[in-house]
Amino acid sequence: MKKSILLGLALVFSIAACQQKERYTQHSPEIDTFKKVIVAYENQDWDALASHYADTAKIMYNKLEKNAMTKAQLLAMHKQDAEAFNSWEFVNGESEYEMVVTDKGETWVNFWGIWKGDFKPTQKTYTIPAHYTARFANGKIVKEFGYWDLSELMLDFQKIQAEQKLKNEETAITETQNSDNEL
């Protein structure tokens, strides 16, 4: 009888151990969903991209959670950014995905990739490492953080803006001088 009880307990514990959810993997439905998000972003398929986010999703790209974007704001930002680029993509073969389940039972997908985009104002191609981490619930992204360094692109853009401002000022001065000479 004692052996039967011990054997039964051992069987229960081994079954329970086998049923624990995997806490780390590089293959999961959530990773597959995030890959679809990346493809939709690259193809500028905003409806497909939006379909993977919960309506109440909070999105933080290089900002604190208190300044989170909504799904609608994310789509508006992507559409505006798309106007400024001839093309963009994440470099093939340079991306890594992983999924982790936290001690609290939260499911997060991490993505590391190399983003490459041809910026219209500078006619220059920028290559920027990027990291995203997205929390999933019920198959949808409910929270997403993204981190990358845009300093090179921004400095180049500011230089173009400063040059344009100088040209505008020179034009205004020339027009004023011409107007004064006519009087």
Give the label of every model feature segment:
Residues M1-C18:
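Sec-dependent bacterial lipoprotein signal peptides
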Residues C18-N43, D47, Q164-E182:
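Short, low-complexity N-terminal intrinsically disordered segments enriched in polar/charged residues
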Residues K21-T25, T122-T125, E152-A162:
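A short acidic/glycine-rich loop-to-helix N-cap element
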Residues D45-M60:
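Short, well-ordered alpha-helical segments enriched in acidic and aromatic residues
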Residues Y53, Y61, G113-G117, Y132, ...:
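Short beta-strand segments enriched in hydrophobic/aromatic residues
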Residues K58-T70, E83-A84:
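A short gly/proline-enriched turn/hairpin at secondary-structure junctions
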Residues A76-T122:
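Surface-exposed, charged secondary-structure patches
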Residues T127-Q158:
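Short beta-strand edge/turn micro-motifs at domain boundaries
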